[in-house]
Curated annotation (Swiss-Prot):
Name of the protein described by the UniProt record: Kappa-conotoxin SrXIA
Annotated source species: Conus spurius
Main localization (coarse): secreted
Other information: Negative results: has no effect on Kv1.3/KCNA3 channels.
Record note on domains: The cysteine framework is XI (C-C-CC-CC-C-C).
Protein role: Kappa-conotoxins bind and inhibit voltage-gated potassium channels. This toxin inhibits Kv1.2/KCNA2 and Kv1.6/KCNA6. Produces stiffening of body, limbs and tail when injected intracranially into mice.
Top-level taxonomic group: Eukaryota
Residues forming coiled coils: none
Pfam families linked: Conotoxin_I2 (PF17557)
Amino acid sequence: CRTEGMSCEENQQCCWRSCCRGECEAPCRFGP
């Protein structure tokens, strides 16, 4: 899942909760 340009809430729904720390870190850009 790509989270580039996504908001923090969208990132949480798409990736892992731990990715929500201001910005999406590189390892978090691609999730399950």
